[in-house]
Amino acid sequence: NPTRTALETCLAGLEGGDFGLCFASGMAAIDTVLRLFSPGDHILAGNDVYGGTFRLFEVVLRPLGLDFTFVDSTDLASGAAGLRSNTRLIWLETPSNPLLGVVDLPGVAQLSSSNAVTGKRPLVAVDNTFATPYLQRPLELGADIVVHSATKYLGGHSDVVGGAVVVNDPDLHARLAFLQNAAGAVPGPQDCFLVLRGVKTLPVRMDRHA
């Protein structure tokens, strides 16, 4: 849909990314990212993630074979101790919802790149819902994947539900775009229009929030 394409392009630009994908909700976006991984893969996550994210990880995905460890994401030593040879993803929220924990993203990116435990670098995914790209652009700080619930500050008017993923890597984008199409959890044109409308006032609203 051209309106969805316009929103995907807009959000990718705001995040300083090359590719954007939009979804029917933030949880649909998160679920799509987690579908990149296979049974036996390990995901390291913050211990204060959004409750819906925790439920998806623990109640839905763990029984399907994904393994999760939750650590204090504000403590790099805790994160380093949680890495395993099969860690494929580091999942972060910063600020976290609802405790507003702040993560050292460049530090985590370095931890991922220099991980001596595994020969395969884990991807770093950041839920940027609370900061928005107005206050923080995780791709510029070393993240591979940025996720949003557009329902909150991007939409900004409490009248739309949506989600988004932004990446730079073309192969990663192709895999996520296939999953987006295969699962079909995409927003309708009106929802995309409402988020595009909301983005126009994002700087004014975030200035007042901050």
Model-inferred region functions:
Residues 1-13:
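A glycine-/small-polar-enriched, mobile loop at the entrance of the PLP active site in fold-type I
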Residues 19-210:
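Conserved PLP-enzyme active-site core in the AAT-like
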